[in-house]
Each structure stands twice: as C-alpha cells, then as structure tokens.
C-alpha cells in the first residue's frame, strides 16, 4: 500500500468510529429524554441517525476493505446489497435534511399554526414519502444490474459494466442526482433563506427596542451599554452562522462526490482514483457532522448527553467504591471471640 492509500484507510477508520459513537449518542439521547421524543422533528433526526449508523456499519467497512485489497472485498450478492443500501441511505439522509429545513421554515414563518401544520401524522407521511423516494432509485438500478463494485471509489455503489447501457445509465444517473442532491439543496436554500429573512426582521425589531431603551437610560453604566451592543451584534450573526452551517456542510460533503459522479460519465475527463476515494470520504463525513450539526450541539441534546455521561460516571464511581469497600473488609483480620 502506498502512503496515500494508508492515509485514506486511516481517514475511513476515523470516520467510521466517530460516526458510530456520535450517532449512537444521539440515539441514546432520544431514548433517554421524553422531551426530545415529544418533538415532531425528532422523527426526522431519528431517521437521519439510523441512516448514518447503517452507512457506518455497511458501506464504510467495505470501502475500507476495498482500499486495502484494491478489489471487491466481498461476494457479488453482498456487494449488491451494500450498493443498494448505500444509494437508499444517501438519498434518505438528504431528504431528511430537507424535511428538517421544512420543519424549521414552518416553525419560524408560521409559528401560530405550526402545531396544526406539522403534527406527528404529517411527519410520518413525509417520512414515508422519503423512504419511497429513496427506495425507487436503487430498485431500478438493481433490476437493471447497475449496482456493483466501483474501483474508482473502492465502494459498492451505482456502477454500469455494460457499454451498450451507457446512454440509459447516464440518463438514470442525471435524474437520480437531480431528484436527490439538487432537489434537497433547492429545498434547503429556499427554506433556510426564508428563515434567515424572518430572523433578521425580528433582530431589527429587537435592536430598535434595545436602542430606544439605551437612549432612555442615560445614566446607565458604560459596561452595561457595551454588553447590550455586543449581544446585539451576536444576535445578528447567530442565525446566519447556523444556516450557513446547515447549507455549507451539505454542499461541502455531497457536492464533490456528486460532481465527480457526473464528470465520470464523460469519457473525456480522467479522474484520479485517489480523488474518487477522497470524494467518497467527504460524502461519508456527512454521517459524522450530522449528529453535531442537528443534535448534539443543541442545548436540549447537550443537557441530555451530559446527564447520561454523569449518570454513567456516577454509577461507575459507586461500583468502584463498593468494590474498594469489599476489598478493605476482606483484608481486616477476623475478630477473636
């Protein structure tokens, strides 16, 4: 193995381990907290978490083996199943992010009617459509034998081995990425930009009230005035940072892989095998970033996982104290009657 291959294999191992740990922690938070389970967006986050977990235990290990052995690491049947799952899970995770953005849009733009517009039943219907949409493409690909081991990405994924099917495969690939990546990106941009517009409007209203208050309080201490102005600046940047993170991570992780898949269809451009695996690793990195972007760094999830960790540490400290006490009692000499 070359130094590049060793480095790429190490990256895949790190992505796999972090994705497993982070998504399992999100799942534990969901099971531990009744408040999180009551929230409608929790269904979308739960679906996204399961997609990321399945990706970490199915596609990532085979990609690691493909990098190491430079060949198909498993039998055709296993590779077909993993390729089917990879296509389904990637599409489902993209559409789950789009569904989360729609939920935020309804909550911010229509706050008074949110609970009537986004109920558990509505979320379940959206989730059902997500699964049907995600399953349709791998079913078509599997029926036409367009799933297999792709050496460029060292992965079991969409792949056409027959030259006579090239035109149909090009059309299928274009439609697939348009109705998965591009559709999700359009929904993300539309909804989050609407959310940002409303957030900025509310910030301006709060800023006007703050400035009027500061003008009236002429004897206010300069340090208090400075803190108010600093909070005003932070408020303006907070929504922009969050929305930039949502859209930015989506583009950064998925766009290189999607563009590479589309460019690959042209026989004119040569794509390096190293770049193919790098683009695949970037797509895998979404399974690592999603738990932090959508869950673990939010206040409610942060409080929950801290409670879980403290509970585990407290229990382990009690057990260790009990063991130490038993050991001490055993070492004491017996009392003579």
Which functions belong to the PLM regions below?
Residues 15-19, 47-60, 87, 126-138, ...:
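Alpha-helical transmembrane segments of multi-pass membrane proteins
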Residues 97-102, 106-109, 142-151, 176-215, ...:
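Class A (rhodopsin-like) GPCR signature focused on the TM5-ICL3 interface and adjacent 7TM helical core
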Residues 12, 16, 29, 54-70, ...:
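Helix-to-loop junction signature of class
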């Amino acid at each position: 193995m070359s130094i590049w291959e060793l480095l790429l294999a190490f990256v895949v191992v790190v992505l796999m381990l972090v994705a497993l740990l982070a998504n399992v922690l999100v799942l534990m938070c969901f099971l531990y907290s009744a408040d999180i389970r009551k929230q409608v967006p929790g269904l979308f986050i739960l679906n996204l978490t399961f997609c990321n977990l399945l990706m970490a235990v199915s596609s990532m290990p085979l990609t690691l083996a493909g990098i190491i052995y430079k060949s198909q690491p498993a039998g055709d049947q296993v590779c077909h199943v993993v390729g089917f799952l990879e296509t389904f899970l990637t599409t489902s995770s993209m559409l789950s992010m789009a569904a989360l953005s729609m939920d935020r849009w309804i909550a911010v733009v229509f706050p008074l009617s949110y609970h009537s517009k986004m109920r558990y039943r509505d979320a379940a219907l959206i989730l059902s459509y997500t699964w049907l949409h995600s399953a349709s493409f791998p079913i078509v690909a599997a029926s036409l034998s367009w799933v297999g081991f792709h050496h460029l990405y060292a992965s079991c994924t969409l792949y056409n081995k027959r030259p006579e099917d090239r035109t149909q495969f090009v059309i299928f690939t274009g439609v697939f990425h348009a109705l998965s990546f591009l559709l999700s990106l359009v929904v993300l941009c539309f909804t989050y930009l609407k959310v940002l517009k409303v957030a900025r409007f509310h910030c301006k209203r709060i800023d006007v009230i703050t400035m009027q208050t500061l003008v009236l309080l002429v004897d206010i201490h300069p340090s208090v005035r400075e803190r108010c102005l600093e909070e005003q600046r932070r408020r303006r940047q907070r929504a922009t940072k969050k929305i930039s993170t949502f859209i930015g991570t989506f583009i950064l992780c998925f766009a290189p892989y999607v563009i590479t898949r589309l460019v690959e269809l042209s026989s004119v451009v040569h794509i390096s095998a190293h770049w193919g695996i790098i683009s695949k690793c970037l797509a895998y990195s979404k399974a690592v970033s999603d738990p932090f972007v959508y869950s673990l760094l939010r206040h409610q999830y942060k409080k929950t996982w801290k409670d879980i960790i403290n509970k585990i540490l407290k229990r382990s400290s009690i057990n260790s104290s009990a063991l130490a006490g038993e050991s001490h009692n055993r070492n004491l000499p017996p009392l003579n009657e």
